[in-house]
């Protein structure tokens, strides 16, 4: 279920029964391979786990790396000249990018998901900041600098933001 929360009210957006882009955060937090479970259900109709086996194990945050101009937010297309994803403890990258691949306008701008996990939110943010500093994507523009700005902003660090926060950040 997707919703927005503003001024004490919840606003329903949609309910999706398909796998969501954010599933990686759920996988990290609960240490469950959701895709594997979906395939298993499709194959034999049964989950390999039950509800009382599902326990929160950590904190996780996902950054979506988009091929876009960080100022105008218009799509960026071209050839990826250099691609070097970050790594290290608590870092996961889901991407099909590679040096030499072509990014066209015939797709969603999401080119990678950078997921951190850690014992708490602060550790996740620290790991994401380091990973974004290490991330190298040359040949197309990305929103990496915007994500670094967000992760360093005091409002974000204090978890004091709402649905119009990003607009205020850039005004």
Residue ranges and their predicted role:
Residues 1-171:
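ATP-dependent carboxylate activation and anion-phosphoryl transfer catalytic cores
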């Amino acid at each position: 279920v997707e919703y927005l929360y503003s001024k004490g009210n919840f606003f329903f957006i949609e309910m999706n029964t398909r796998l969501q882009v954010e599933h990686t955060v759920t996988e990290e937090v609960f240490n469950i391979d959701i895709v594997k479970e979906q395939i298993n259900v499709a194959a034999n109709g049964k989950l390999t786990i039950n509800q009382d086996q599902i326990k929160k194990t950590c904190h996780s945050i996902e950054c979506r790396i988009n091929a876009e101009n960080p100022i105008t937010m218009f799509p960026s297309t071209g050839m990826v000249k250099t691609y070097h994803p970050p790594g290290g403890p608590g870092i996961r990258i889901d991407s099909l990018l590679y040096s030499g691949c072509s990014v066209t306008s015939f797709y969603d701008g999401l080119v990678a998901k950078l997921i951190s996990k850690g014992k708490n939110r602060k550790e996740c943010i620290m790991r994401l900041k380091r990973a974004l500093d290490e991330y190298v994507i040359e040949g197309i523009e990305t929103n990496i600098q915007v994500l670094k700005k967000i992760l360093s902003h005091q409002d974000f660090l204090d978890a004091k933001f709402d649905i119009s926060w990003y607009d205020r950040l850039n005004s």
